[in-house]
From Swiss-Prot:
Belongs to the COQ7 family. Keywords: Cell membrane, Iron, Membrane, Metal-binding, Monooxygenase, Oxidoreductase, Ubiquinone biosynthesis. This is 3-demethoxyubiquinol 3-hydroxylase. The gene is coq7. The lineage of its organism: Bacteria, Pseudomonadati, Pseudomonadota, Betaproteobacteria, Neisseriales. It catalyses: a 5-methoxy-2-methyl-3-(all-trans-polyprenyl)benzene-1,4-diol + AH2 + O2 = a 3-demethylubiquinol + A + H2O. It comes from Chromobacterium violaceum (strain ATCC 12472 / DSM 30191 / JCM 1249 / CCUG 213 / NBRC 12614 / NCIMB 9131 / NCTC 9757 / MK).
Length: 206
């Protein structure tokens, strides 16, 4: 158990402090940079910072869930989702830098809270563990859809990243469903949405 904790601590430090790396090509690599106005660039930066913070939260959530998952298939589903979230971290982090910004200063706070939630979800049992994965990815997918509408129309690079992230998240939700994810109670879903609203509002600015 101590080895597991050390491994997860190392993952956490790398998530928060080290540049992320993608095994796949960046979705925007062949797309030219648009000539955005200062206001458009600022807005795109805020949205991509929100998306990066969301991926930090996802990493922590899945790490916490994997620590307490009992079933091998559930652990593998969480591992696979977490690996793709690392790629999302790399994509959004680079885009933030290209837009002239930096990641949210609140990332450590959100990481800690998400890790605790992940551990708690895993303790409840694998069907609820997968249920949290399924609902998280559904909500993130809907959130990314809203960003596709909100991003500047000419910012094709950010839009390509967000579109691929959305497709990945929905695949994760479907994978969790196929593995027997439980449907979370409505109050839990509402609490998750409220938490996400606070996170998005704060990380857009800070």
């Amino acid at each position: 158990m101590l080895d597991k904790l050390i491994t997860e601590l190392d993952k956490g430090l790398r998530t928060l402090c080290a540049p992320a790396h993608s095994g796949r090509a960046h979705p925007d690599q062949d797309i030219a940079e648009a000539d955005l106005s200062a206001a458009e660039k600022k807005h795109a930066l805020g949205l991509m910072r929100v998306n990066h913070c969301g991926e930090v939260c996802a990493q922590a959530l899945y790490q916490g869930q994997a620590l307490t998952a009992r079933d091998a298939s559930a652990r593998e589903a969480l591992r696979q989702a977490a690996q793709e979230e690392v790629e999302h971290l790399a994509w959004t982090e680079r885009r933030i830098r290209e837009l002239g910004g930096r990641p949210s200063l609140l990332n450590p706070l959100w990481y800690t809270g998400s890790l605790a939630l992940g551990v708690a979800a895993g303790v409840l049992g694998d069907k609820w563990n997968l249920g949290f994965l399924q609902e998280t990815e559904r909500q993130v997918g809907a959130h990314l859809d809203s960003h596709l509408s909100a991003l500047p129309p000419d910012d094709a690079r950010s839009r390509a990243i967000v579109r691929q992230m959305r497709d990945d998240e929905l695949q994760h939700a479907e994978m969790a469903h196929e593995l027997g994810a439980a449907e979370l109670p409505a109050p839990v879903k509402a609490a998750m949405k409220l938490s996400a609203k606070v996170m998005t509002g704060s990380s857009y600015r800070v």
